[in-house]
Regions:
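Thiamine diphosphate
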Residues: 1-15, 22, 32, 141-306, ...
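Anionic-ligand anchoring segments at beta-strand to alpha-helix junctions in alpha/beta enzyme folds, i.e.
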Residues: 2-67, 198-233, 436-443, 448-452, ...
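Conserved thiamine diphosphate
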Residues: 71-73, 122, 295-342, 531
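ADP-ribose/adenylate-binding Rossmann-like module
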Residues: 82-99
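Short alpha-helices
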Residues: 96-141, 489, 493
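Cofactor-/ligand-binding subdomain signature composed of acidic, glycine-rich
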Residues: 115-121, 132-173, 369-396
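Flexible, low-complexity linker and terminal segments
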Residues: 177, 184-198, 328, 333-532
Length: 532
């Protein structure tokens, strides 16, 4: 396995933790590094404890790591919260850290503590052997040619040069040429790119962490793309606007998180009976209720699958990476148009708000549409009725006719299954143990498999879609002695869902419910009995 480095910047909200971190990611990309980053923050505007961390390598890296190469604290009393993440080789900088960095003194002549994050970047650049000219270029691109941030970066670099010479290039990176067309996008932005490429032209949302990034991204794109983006007064209005847009012929989507999606459930049901294809971007966070608004979890799988009252068709997609988020947007729009059903794209805070190096595909995707008459057509009309209705949209109550309509509607699921993205297997044909996972946990599992001394004994099966379930999935488990389920919730909702479709009981599960991601180091430790 190639060397993967992990840097973490910590401090209070308002100290520029994320802005400094994103600048670091751009510097890494310019050095030809593959990366994935992630921020954690409380529900506070100022104070508290915020973090930004990035894991990177000259070869592809799938997940953030738990163990740190370098930790840098912008204020006192912060680095101590991360002692369990340190190793004997970790470097720790800060005002009260083992390697003292007097940020207050360094930023005083520059303009104050607002520049502490860029001073920190200078120290990081020194330890990793970054090219200062490349760092200067990224700072200029982010700020301006005469930005004090240039002075701040040089102050940090020079201080490290004068005081930490023993750590010069200690983590020397293997520089590559920058990847052409590579972007740094978070999961919501990746979905947004796919939404635009897939012909999406209407989006409505009421801000709710962690889905808000998609609203911000698409709102900016109104200036350059034929898309309407609305921010109404609440989640019910958002969903209703998307339904109206779909009725009028738009390729429409709405975004929210768990609590907002709970309010939208009647709209999901309406789409199911009125044959309206709307995409729901559901970025989950820990519940119940307000829960942990700025943390991550995979606790909404069953909520998504069984959303809406009554029995009707819906589709649930569960992308696991930034590239899959891009693809899921295109697939969701096409599936919604092909089958005229609600499509839920289920992600979480980890994927929605982590950023990764990503190169958009150059191909133009096929845009699927369903032939139907739109409101205002001269020769006909279409009624979208929330009552049970016949094929012309007229309400019905006759027992035999109702049974016929319901049976015909539900039979569509057999056709839908054929168009869904299939489970993807990673690993050796010799594997005797199979890991099942869905959504963002795929990233940590892939990274863990890359860290194992004997990965040939373990396989991974990732589900990029989970509803409708294909009963034939059960056949994929038969060759394996052990079936393990890894997901970021307390009750193993994937196990519950699979057991509802066919006999299923995993050998073991690795679950998490503290609002933090599952890290590859945890998975490696968990897998030890299965690789020995």
């Amino acid at each position: 396995m190639s060397s993967v480095f992990t840097v973490k910047i910590v401090g209070p909200a308002g100290a520029g933790i994320k802005s400094g971190g994103l600048l670091l990611s751009r510097i890494l990309l310019s050095h030809g590094q593959h990366l994935i980053d992630y921020s954690e923050y409380p529900s506070l505007v100022r104070g508290g404890h915020n973090t930004y961390q990035v894991s990177f390598s000259h070869q592809p890296v799938s997940s953030i790591h738990y163990q740190l190469s370098l930790l840098i604290s912008l204020e006192p009393n912060h680095w101590q919260l991360h002692k369990t993440e340190l190793t004997k080789k970790s470097l720790v900088f800060g005002p009260d850290a083992p390697l003292v960095l007097p940020l207050s003194d360094l930023v005083k002549p520059i303009g104050g503590h607002i520049y502490a994050n860029t001073v920190a970047l200078g120290v990081i650049a020194y330890c990793f052997g970054f090219d200062p000219s490349i760092c200067h270029s990224e700072i200029i691109n982010t700020f301006s040619l005469d930005s004090p941030n240039l002075t701040a970066f040089d102050a940090g670099f020079q201080y490290a040069q004068n005081n930490f010479i023993q750590y010069q290039d200690i983590f020397k990176i293997h520089s590559n040429a920058p990847v052409k067309r590579a972007l740094i996008v978070d999961g919501s932005e990746a979905f947004g790119h796919g939404f635009l490429v897939g012909g999406g032209n209407f989006y409505a949302a009421y801000p709710m962490t962690p889905s808000t990034g998609l609203l911000h991204f698409l709102a900016q794109k109104q200036l350059t793309h034929p898309i309407t983006v609305l921010h109404p007064e609440d989640e019910i209005s958002s969903a209703s606007l998307a339904v109206g847009a779909a009725f009028a012929g738009a390729r429409a989507a709405v975004g929210t998180s768990g609590g907002g999606f709970a309010l939208m459930n009647e709209t999901v049901s309406f789409c199911g009976v009125a044959n309206l294809g709307v995409v729901f971007y559901l970025a989950s966070r820990p519940g119940p209720a307000t829960g942990l608004p700025t943390w991550t979890a995979q606790g909404d799988l069953l909520h998504a699958v069984f959303s809406g009252h009554g029995e009707f068709n819906k589709i649930v997609l569960t992308p696991g990476t930034h590239a899959e988020s891009y693809q899921a947007a295109i697939e969701a729009l096409n599936l919604a148009a092909r089958f005229d059903v609600p499509v839920i794209v289920l992600t979480d805070k980890l994927l929605a708000e982590s950023s990764a190096s990503f190169t958009p595909p150059t191909y133009i995707p096929k845009v699927v549409s369903s032939p139907r008459h739109l409101p205002g057509s001269d020769d006909s009309f279409y009624m979208a009725n929330s009552y049970e209705h016949d094929q012309n949209g007229f309400s019905i109550e006759d027992a035999s006719l109702v049974k016929k309509v319901v049976t015909a509607r539900l039979s569509l699921s057999k056709k839908i299954v054929k168009y869904l993205p299939k489970p993807v297997f990673y690993g050796s044909d010799q594997a005797k143990t199979l890991i099942l996972t869905w959504g963002s946990t795929k990233m940590a599992v892939l990274e863990a498999l890359n860290m194992l001394d004997n990965p040939s004994k373990i396989g991974l099966l990732h589900f990029p879609s989970l509803w409708p379930i294909n009963p034939n999935w059960a056949l994929m488990f038969k060759p394996f002695k052990n079936i393990l389920v890894i997901e970021n919730n307390a009750t193993s909702q994937l196990s519950t869902l699979l057991a509802s479709a066919f006999p299923f009981k995993p050998t073991s599960t690795l679950l998490n419910c503290d609002g933090r991601p599952i890290y590859p180091e945890q998975i490696v430790k968990y897998l030890k009995p299965y690789v020995s």
